[in-house]
From Swiss-Prot:
Alphabetized GO MF terms: small ribosomal subunit rRNA binding; structural constituent of ribosome
Protein's name according to its UniProt entry: Small ribosomal subunit protein bS20
Function: Binds directly to 16S ribosomal RNA.
Species lineage: Bacteria, Pseudomonadati, Campylobacterota, Epsilonproteobacteria, Campylobacterales
Similarity section: Belongs to the bacterial ribosomal protein bS20 family.
Recorded superkingdom: Bacteria
Annotated Gene Ontology cellular component terms: cytosol; small ribosomal subunit
Pfam family, one: Ribosomal_S20p
Keyword Ribonucleoprotein: yes
NCBIfam families for the chain: S20
Keyword check for RNA-binding: yes
Alphabetical keyword list: Ribonucleoprotein, Ribosomal protein, RNA-binding, rRNA-binding
């Protein structure tokens, strides 16, 4: 266990941030899954609307520091390419 007040606080902060990031990462996986399922169903309108939601949320996760901007750009690019291939 930590002995210093500052390290105890850091541990507390890490726990809170880890929980928050886990929530965001789970949400990201579900959003991407929605887009992928619309693509496999062949429903272009549903895939396009899900892509709009995914794009907005992925950019929000970048601003919150959950994702790096390069990772987000790669995810968005791959999803757009898959939607356009329908």
């Amino acid at each position: 266990m930590a002995n210093h007040k500052s390290s105890i606080k850091r541990i507390r902060q890490t726990i809170v941030r880890s929980e928050r990031n886990r929530f965001y990462r789970t949400r990201l996986k579900n959003i991407v899954k929605d887009v992928r399922s619309a693509i496999t169903a062949g429903n272009k309108e549903e895939a396009a609307s899900a892509m709009g939601v995914a794009n907005k949320q992925i950019q929000k996760f970048v601003s919150k520091g959950v994702l790096k901007k390069e990772t987000a750009a790669r995810k968005i690019s791959r999803l757009h390419r898959a939607v356009n291939a329908i």
